[in-house]
Swiss-Prot record:
It comes from Sebaldella termitidis (strain ATCC 33386 / NCTC 11300). Keywords: Cell inner membrane, Cell membrane, Membrane, Protein transport, Translocation, Transmembrane, Transmembrane helix, Transport. It is found in: Cell inner membrane. Forms a complex with SecF. Part of the essential Sec protein translocation apparatus which comprises SecA, SecYEG and auxiliary proteins SecDF. Other proteins may also be involved. The keyword Nucleotide-binding does not apply. This is Protein translocase subunit SecD. The chain crosses the membrane at residues 8-28, 240-260, 262-282, 289-309, 334-354, 361-381. Belongs to the SecD/SecF family. SecD subfamily. GO terms for molecular function: protein-transporting ATPase activity. Its main location: membrane. GO terms for cellular component: plasma membrane. It comes from the Bacteria.
Amino acid sequence: MEIKTSRIVILILVVVIPAILIFRNPINLGLDLRGGTSVVLEAQEEDGKKLQPDTMDKVREIVQRRVDGLGVSEPVIQKSGENRLIVELAGVKDAQEAIDLIGTTAKLEFKIKTGDNSYGPTVLDGSAIKNAYVQQDQFGKPMIGFELNDEGAVKFAEITRTNMGKQLAIMLDGKEQSAPVIQSEIPGGKGSISGSFTYESAQNLANLLKAGALPVNIQIMETRSVDASLGAESIKATKMAAMIALVLVSLFMLAVYRVAGFVADLALCVFGILTAGLMCAIGTTLTLPGIAGFILSLGMAVDANVIIFERIKDEIMEGKRFQDCIDDGFNRAFPAILDGNITTLLITMVLFFFGTGPVRGFAVILTIGVLVSMFTAIFITKIIVKIFVNIFHLNGEKLFGLKGVE
């Protein structure tokens, strides 16, 4: 029985490339495994007006930019219903700081101050901000520098030219941050906001200004924190459960299918490496439901091998030539494996499009696992079987422990 060199090369690449990806880009762990913070935000209707259809999309985009400023890896930000947003931040160091940053409306306004606590109408707002950053004043204290877009720069120059000697109040969410006296016209669209800032608070405000103001008021409805130690315990328990399941499955395959069972165990190892490698490549976040999806797909991979081996045994018992039995067994097993996996994929599609959070994570991992299990069962297992048959000169009796067959 000949086996093409190209297929052996493919087998090697299927193992080596995912292994490199796993080593260089470890799998992202979700909130329940790594620890972190989950926040539920709700957009508030103003003056009885219903939210516009695209309002939550704008809120999500702005919250995404704010979270990016925190440096959190792989945040999960998704809509829930018509007016809610779920934000999951795994591994965040300061939960309260993150919550404050996410939930702040950050409505920036420039107003001419007319008295101690009175202001004129808004002459410029945060929509004109092009960039914001932290810089130091003459005393080395942090303040926020900002740059305006072209339209904002022209308007800012006009405001400062026509209001010399007056105070220009810089307001954030209705609170005065600073109110410098306009000494001269300010061209170029650059300015600064000073105040009693620490470096961290200045950086947060700069991030808020860069991300932009939320189009509606947001209320924090729920916050939930998961301690990192709980995530570590979950990982430990899950690893133990997965190892026990893997050992039991491996022993079962060895006991029932002998050498072919060992081949199936090797194929399962390839399945695990390839699945993890794909998760790293596409940046999938692994959660506890995702692990459940992986273990379920592992079981489906075992089922596929069982179907294949039973078909091969049927071919052998019919007295066909052994080399033909292997090819025919794989070919006849393929329709049953395909049908079973397609029905599972249809279910995962429903879960992904109509589910939220953990349910979608489960669906994504299960989908990856099902696709990989089909590939490993039909292609990888066949290559390994033929390699074993060629090297060890196996027949039906040696491969499956069948008596009285060649």
